[in-house]
Amino acid sequence: VLDSYVARTQRLLQNPAAPTSLYSEADLTLYINIARGQLAGEAECIKVLGTIDTVVDQQAYDFADIDTGVAATNGVQGVINVSQAWYTVGTGRKWIAPKPWPWFSLYTFNNPVPQGNYPTTWSQYGQGAAPGDTGSVNGGNFYINTPDQVYSLVLDCSCYPIALVDDTTVEAIPYLWTDAVPWYAAAYALWSAQNNARMADAERYFNTYTMFVERARKASNPSINRWMYSQSGDPAQAAKMQVQPRGGAGG
């Protein structure tokens, strides 16, 4: 898939062949991988049920320790955020209630002598993704109420992909979102030129990227209960913000 990304990005940039190439293939590969990471975070399109085992009396767990499968097989590098959590019981699972960090800090964390129990609440604290090829040493983590024994947790994770190094690298980003990647990569290349005309072109390309991301989300959600997915946005948002139709048009 990398070769296809590079070719499509070159066409968008009308990149001439060597020796007058404006953007090297190495640079385009870098921009493509940046685009893929940003897309994965924005669209939350790489979903994995990750797993992690608790440690007795340990509340904090790093995203980096969540098992999301074999990266070389599924193309997943790591976790960006967690939206739901369960713990396994017998052959089934029980839901763990998510809480905002201020609530968790006051009602669960705020205890000099915490008592062990089965998982009842959890909260994300750390932000962002690491490690992998991010260059960051920090990353997200989450807390649960003090576990009294080892529990196997199942986590609903939004993930980011491994970097593409050649055409055999597995792509974790699903279609239709893959159509957006070359547009972001081309925009990034034009931004790097630091030229007014190219910067203007970059904004147009970025707007096209945004359109493809939105279309992919709409296409991926079923017609029934379309708005039940958090990534879809709120159809009543305009009314809540008291935004009026242009030109006095009716609602």
Regions found by a protein language model. Give the residues of each.
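Glycine-enriched, solvent-exposed interface loops adjoining structured elements
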Residues: 1-251
